[in-house]
Design a protein with these regions (language model features):
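N-terminal, Lys/Arg-enriched amphipathic/low-complexity engagement segments
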Residues: 2-6, 13-37
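PDZ-domain C-terminal substructure recognizer with occasional recognition of PDZ-binding tails
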Residues: 2-15, 73-105
Length: 244
């Protein structure tokens, strides 16, 4: 007789080693366009309320282009990205109570913060955070044009509690002398990019082989973290796993 065989796809992952870091970093990210975080009302010259962008713009839109001219009361066309699709929408600015033209949109074009560099690989690439950079108002992953890593001094650490994550507060000096590298990607798994010589000097520990998520077990483990000025290993306990 004939025995049927089921075909199964197999993905082979090459052995890879990464240098663990655990040092704090300052992060600056410029958005790919101007992020719309909301719309709002304002008063016209006659005191009545208006909101030109209401029902036109949505939180999470990225404005890519405007007319490129001085804003007047004439209709303007905004080129924006929404859910991966480019759109052209018209808005007519209104004069506010001070005589300035507005469209009634709250926008943001950058994000800053502090985090932890997770690893450096043999090609000088880094991975950091372990989660993406999301906008604080929309909670959406930010579309990034470019970004920069900086040195930072941690001035305060708040311990996490159940339902509330811990927090690091740091001081960042945004100057060329303090740059550690450039950020090329912002994803749900973290931020990634390239290290300069100063950042490579942070990778002084021996490389470790990467592990697959299926290899993670409940029980004692260690994390590498900077709490008092230098990166050290700390004992932890893994009490639950969510692999999906």
């Amino acid at each position: 007789g004939i025995l049927p065989f089921k075909q199964v796809g197999i993905q082979v992952i090459e052995d890879q080693e990464l240098i663990p870091v655990g040092s704090p970093i300052g992060i600056y990210v410029k958005t790919d366009g101007v992020l719309v975080v909301g719309t709002g009302d304002f008063k016209r010259e006659d005191g009545t309320e208006c909101s030109p962008c209401k029902y036109v713009l949505k939180s999470g839109d990225y404005i890519r282009k405007v007319n490129g001219e001085t804003v007047t009361g004439k209709e303007i066309v905004l080129t924006l990205e929404r859910d991966g699709e480019l759109l052209e929408l018209a808005v007519t600015p209104e004069k506010d109570s001070t005589g300035k033209y507005k469209i009634g949109a709250w926008v943001r074009d950058n994000a800053q913060g502090v985090g932890t560099m997770t690893y450096i690989d043999s090609q000088g690439h880094f991975g950091a955070l372990g989660h993406g950079i999301a906008d604080v108002d929309t909670s959406m992953l930010m579309l990034m044009e470019d970004g920069t890593l900086y040195e930072t001094n941690i001035v305060d650490i708040k311990k996490g509690t159940t339902g509330t994550p811990g927090e690091m507060t740091g001081m960042i000096v945004y100057s060329n002398d303090h740059i550690l590298g450039d950020i090329t990607s912002n994803s749900s798994k973290g931020i990634f990019g390239n290290c300069n010589e100063k950042a490579l000097a942070m990778g002084t520990r021996e490389p470790l082989p990467i592990g697959l998520k299926q290899e993670i077990k409940l029980g004692p483990a260690q994390i590498l973290c900077t709490v008092d000025g230098s990166a050290k290993y700390y004992d932890i306990e893994i009490t639950a796993l969510h692999l999906d």
